[in-house]
Amino acid sequence: MFQGASSLSLDAKGRLSVPTRHRDVLVATAAGLLTITRHPHGCLMLFPRPEWEKFRERIAELPMSAQWWKRIFLGNAMDVEIDATGRVLISPELRQAAGIAKDTMLLGMGRHFELWDKASYEAQEAQAMQGAMPDVFKDFSF
């Protein structure tokens, strides 16, 4: 399970250094193989390959009424591998789709990660914090 936030920068070639605490788990559980695709909230999702395969099956089973969402998730998916120095290449197409130029936030979201443009993430987080909490949290104890 992945959790926590990391402020990271892409290098000039669009590569992201995976934090060591996540890299070790990804190498052990997924042989360093990841799949990256678009998220409907404007960020990217990074899945360890075994988790991607489960997600892909669920998406593939959706009805024809969800065809565009199948295209968004599956048609934009790119398989990548963590290189010898712990980096993954974020394709230009995916960087453009998420508005990512250099500064990013990598968020552990349990079984996958979200990769955000840092400024976009900070703005959306601030907006969410100013709003009311969703009803699902009304009986949640902190």
From Swiss-Prot:
SS bond partners: none
This protein's GO CC annotations: cytoplasm; nucleoid
SpoVT-AbrB domain residues: 5-51, 77-120
Pfam families in UniProt: MraZ
Keywords: Cytoplasm, DNA-binding, Repeat, Transcription, Transcription regulation
Gene3D superfamilies: Transcriptional regulator MraZ domain
GO biological process: negative regulation of DNA-templated transcription initiation
Keyword Isomerase in record: no
InterPro entries named in the record: MraZ, MraZ_C, MraZ_dom, MraZ_N, MraZ_sf, SpoVT-AbrB_dom, SpoVT-AbrB_sf
Family of the protein in this entry: Belongs to the MraZ family.
Oligomeric form and interacting partners: Forms oligomers.
Protein name: Transcriptional regulator MraZ
Organism this protein belongs to: Verminephrobacter eiseniae (strain EF01-2)
